[in-house]
Amino acid sequence: MEGLTTLIRNGNRRRTLAVVWLAGVALLALLAPALPLPYPAGVPDLAHVAEAPARASHHWLGTDPQGCDVLSGLLFGARTALLLSLPAALLAALLGGLAGGAAGFWGNRLRMSIPGGGLVAIIVARSVGVPVPALAMGAGVLGMLWAGRRMRRLSATIPVPLDSLVMAAASSLDTVPRLVLVLALAARGGLSVAGLGLVLGLTSWSGPARLVRARMLSISHLPFIEAAQASGLSPARVWWHHALPHALRPLQTALPLSLAALLALESTLSFLGVGLPPDVPSWGLQLAAARQQPQAWWAILFPALILSLTILSFNILTAKRTSPAV
C-alpha cells in the first residue's frame, strides 16, 4: 500500500512538472517578440561565430556555427513549434473525431436521399459530354436540387457505406509512413507555418478517427442512446447531441500524444531542410546548423534538451494512473 501511494505521488509530481514546463514554454513562446533579447533570432553575429556561453558576454547561451544567438533561436523556435503543432493537432482531432464518430454511429447503414432534380442533374452531367463552365454547371445543379426538393418527385435513396469509406481512407493513409508522405508533399515547394500545419493536420487524422470510432461502437447501443432514439429524435440529432460528446473523450488522452508526434515530425523535417523556409526559426534548424561544427556542443545540447523535455512532458501527461496487479 505504501509503495502504491509513493507511485501515485511520484506520478502527480511528474505531471505537475510537465504542466509547469509546458506552460513555461508556451508563455515564453507567446512573449518572445516582446522579450528584451540582445540579438534577434536568425541574424548572424559574424564577430562571434560558434562561441561558447562563457566566452560570449552578450550571447547568454552562445552562438551557433552561423553566428546566430542560441537563446533567441530557442525562444522563437518554441513559438514556431506552438503555432504549428497545436493547430495541426486540433485539425487532426476535429477531422478524425467527426469521421470516426460518423463511421461508428451509422456504420454502413447510412442512406442518402437525392431529390428528383438532383438525380436528373447527376445523370445528365455524367452522360452528356457537352463542355459547360463549372460555375454554370454548379448553378444548374443547385437549381435542379431546389426544384426537385420543392416538387418532391422522382426522389431516390442510395446507400452510403460510410464506415467502409472512412476506414479505407484511414488505412490508405496509414499505408505510407507519415514522414515519407509529408516529405513528398512538403518537397514540392517552400511551405509557410500555416501551410505545413495544414499538411500535418490532414495527414494525421487517421489515429483519432480509429479511437473515436471504437468508442462510438461501444456506446452506440447503450441505454441512454436507445432512449434518445426512442424519444423520436432524428439520428443526426442523437449523434450530435448525445453520442458524439461521449465518443470524443479518448481525444483528451490522444491530443498530447499527437502534439508530441507532430513536434518531433516538424523538427525532423526542419533538420532535413524540408518544410519550413530557412528564415523561420525552428529547433530542428538549430540542430541542423550545429552539424557544421560538432565541437560546438552548446549549439546541439540546448535545442536537443528543450525538444526532448517538451516531448517527454507531453508523454507524461498521457500516462494514466494505474495500480500494480495484486
Language-model regions: role of each:
Residues 7-8, 37-38, 46-50, 211, ...:
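Intrinsically disordered, low-complexity segments enriched in polar/charged residues with Gly/Pro
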Residues 3-12, 57-63, 67-71, 286-290:
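A short amphipathic helical element positioned immediately N-terminal to and/or at the very start
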Residues 30-72, 273:
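Short membrane-interfacial helix/loop motifs at transmembrane-helix boundaries
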Residues 68, 72-326:
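Alpha-helical transmembrane segments of integral membrane proteins
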Residues 1-41, 112-123, 166-169, 173:
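N-terminal signal-anchor/first transmembrane alpha helix
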